[in-house]
Every structure is written in structure tokens, then in C-alpha cells.
UniProtKB/Swiss-Prot annotation:
Keywords: Chloroplast, Plastid, Ribonucleoprotein, Ribosomal protein, RNA-binding, rRNA-binding. One of its GO terms (molecular function) is structural constituent of ribosome. Part of the 50S ribosomal subunit; contacts the 5S rRNA. It comes from the Eukaryota. Binds 5S rRNA, forms part of the central protuberance of the 50S subunit. This is Large ribosomal subunit protein uL5c. The lineage of its organism: Eukaryota, Sar, Stramenopiles, Ochrophyta, Bacillariophyta. GO terms for cellular component: chloroplast; cytosolic large ribosomal subunit. One of its GO terms (biological process) is translation. It is found in: Plastid, Chloroplast. The gene is rpl5. Pfam families: Ribosomal_L5, Ribosomal_L5_C. Belongs to the universal ribosomal protein uL5 family.
Length: 238
């Protein structure tokens, strides 16, 4: 039977989960439409979280049955669902990898489990990281998805110190779903949509760094286009 303290913690977590869902579903639409009605007049252009992908690479250690079983148990506790075992698509002799060899674990969260995991990350997990200074805004990809890594599993409340034989990290990707019009289909627009959503959800992103010195997003776009041109020029020379 659960103790009164654990029941109170569960109730508190559920309350935070409901708050963050309600804030997103009821709040972000009105906030974005008021701040910029031209860009977000269509509700389909408002950024939303589609899924969270969590991965762990084990390498050749996955051939050890005990290590694989412990990793599956940890993943199940952390994510709330049993992970899929990722396998090698083709053999690589130099790395001693055979085709269909077990190499890691992967889990995809949607709906209620996605919001539950996100709430746990924001309110509990990040607070356990020593000297945590926030996450870099440079970890967005061209589609506006955000990927970051956690170095150890001990920062999650479900993992007990005595149960861990080997410290292993996780790679987490927040996949966004936003339909941008043709006028805002550039990479910088997708990244800005991702930043808007994660900031609204109180995700601990660092400030924009050197982007602060630019007066408008148009200047930032020019810098990005210039970098692309230099990159293409370097590739053509090679």
C-alpha cells in the first residue's frame, strides 16, 4: 500500500501535468494570436508538440543479457512504457557488428504519457542536474525539432542509486508539428516556432546568445543565408 507521502507526490505531479496541458491547450492560441495575428491567424500554424522520442545506444554491451534487461527495466520506469530494441540494419566488419544485432533501445511517447514525461523533465529532472545552466538554443534541427542528451539516469526519480551498476545516458528529441505557410517556410521560421513553444511550456532554454545583437529576424535570416552560401562554396572547392 502506498504511503501518504507518495500519494501526495502523485497528486502534486498529476496537478502539474493537468496545469501544463491546460496552459498549452487554452493559452498558447490566444497568446500567439494577440501577439502576432498575421502569422498565427490560422490555428494550424500554431506550433504543437507531436511526440517525444527517447533513445539509448548500448553498442556491443547490448549482447550482455543482464545489461540489456537492466536497461529495458530502467527505460520502462522512466518512460512508462516498454521500449523497442533497435537492431543493426547491415553488418559492419570493422566494428564487429552483424546484421540484426541488438544495439540499443528506443521509445516514442504520445498523448498523456508525452505530457507526463515532459512535466517530469521540467519540474523534477532538470533540477537534479549538478550546475545546470539551461539547454542550448542551438540544438534545433532544420525542421524545428529539439534534441538534447542527459548524461545519467540517476536524475530521474524512478531510478534508485543501489539499482544502478553502470551510469548510462539518454538522447531525447522533442518532435514538433507545425504547418508553416510558404512565406515562413525557412529554417529560421521553424526554429523560432520551436523556441516559442518550448519557452511557453517553461522549458529551460538559454537566451539566444549572439542573436541578441540583431534588431530584427530579417538580419538573422541574412546571416543564415550567408553561412549556407559559404558552406556550398567550400563543398564545391572540395
Amino acid at each position: 500500500m502506498r504511503s501518504q507521502q507518495s500519494l501526495e507526490e502523485i497528486a502534486e505531479l498529476y496537478g502539474l501535468l493537468e496545469n501544463i496541458k491546460k496552459e498549452y491547450e487554452d493559452g498558447i492560441h490566444s497568446v500567439l494570436r494577440k501577439s502576432n495575428p498575421e502569422l498565427f491567424s490560422n490555428p494550424h500554424t500554431i506550433p504543437k508538440l507531436k511526440k517525444i522520442s527517447i533513445n539509448r545506444g548500448l553498442g556491443l554491451a547490448a549482447q550482455n543479457t543482464n545489461i540489456l534487461k537492466k536497461s529495458i527495466t530502467e527505460f520502462t520506469r522512466i518512460t512508462g512504457q516498454k521500449p523497442l530494441i533497435t537492431r543493426a540494419k547491415k553488418a559492419v566488419a570493422g566494428f564487429k557488428i552483424r546484421e540484426e544485432m541488438e544495439l540499443g533501445l528506443s521509445s516514442t511517447l504520445r498523448g498523456e504519457k508525452m505530457y507526463s514525461f515532459l512535466t517530469k523533465l521540467i519540474f523534477f529532472t532538470f533540477a537534479q542536474i549538478r550546475d545546470f545552466r539551461g539547454l542550448s538554443v542551438r540544438s534545433f534541427d532544420k525542421a524545428g525539432n529539439y534534441t538534447f542528451s542527459l548524461k545519467e539516469q540517476l536524475i530521474f526519480p524512478e531510478i534508485e542509486y543501489d539499482d544502478v551498476d553502470q551510469v548510462q545516458g539518454l538522447s531525447i528529441t522533442l518532435v514538433l508539428d507545425s504547418s508553416t505557410p510558404k512565406s515562413r517556410s525557412k529554417t529560421v521560421d521553424r526554429v523560432l516556432n520551436g523556441m516559442i513553444l518550448l519557452k511557453f511550456l517553461r522549458f529551460p532554454l538559454n537566451d539566444c546568445g549572439y542573436y541578441d545583437k540583431y534588431e530584427s529576424f530579417g538580419e538573422i535570416t541574412q546571416v543564415w543565408d550567408k553561412k549556407k552560401h559559404l558552406r556550398r562554396k567550400r563543398w564545391s572547392q572540395e
